A protein has these predicted regions:
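A detector for small-residue-rich transmembrane helices and their helix-helix packing motifs
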Residues: 1-163
Length: 163
């Protein structure tokens, strides 16, 4: 596929939906069998990272509930469409996955570190969802200045806020 297509966004939406369906089915299977923890083992990125290493990838496409899925889907369409139109399908998917995986790993490591400090009331946390990938797309849009002539270019700041 050549540049200028929104197809990668549609593909990701389909992947999100398929993974969510698998999560629901795995949850049902875990509830009626002795497979408690199946969904977490397949999709939730949690410390220690080496225990279920595939979750570095699968957690990017999984979601906690339907609201989480829908909010990430809307953000993906808003921020992903301009990026998808500016790059190739392969680069778009690779960028999204790397941003999402890196964000998840950093969040898990950061909360694990903070939980070890006596002055911080923090617990090591588990993560899942496409927010890291979506924010990576937003960062790309802001850093590449693609928004300046369209959305962000039409917003004027008061003199006190401008640099």
């Amino acid at each position: 596929m050549e540049n200028g297509s929104g197809t990668p966004v549609i593909e990701l939406l389909l992947v999100f939906s398929a993974v969510f369906a698998i999560q629901v089915l795995a949850g049902i299977a875990a509830a009626i069998t002795s497979l408690a923890g199946l969904v977490d083992a397949l999709f939730v990125l949690a410390p220690p990272l080496g225990e279920n290493p595939w979750t570095v990838v699968t957690s990017v496409y999984a979601h906690a509930d339907l609201g989480h899925l829908l909010s990430n889907a809307v953000a993906l369409v808003v921020f992903g469409w301009p990026v998808a139109r500016a790059t190739t399908r392969t680069r778009f998917h690779a960028f999204f996955l790397v941003c999402g995986a890196l964000a998840g790993v950093v969040q898990v490591l950061t909360t694990a570190f903070l939980a070890g400090l006596p002055i911080v009331a923090a617990e090591p946390t588990a993560v899942l969802g496409a927010s890291g990938g979506v924010f990576g797309l937003l960062g790309y849009l802001l850093a590449s200045n693609r928004l300046s002539s369209s959305i962000a270019g039409s917003v004027s700041l008061p003199p006190l806020l401008s640099v």
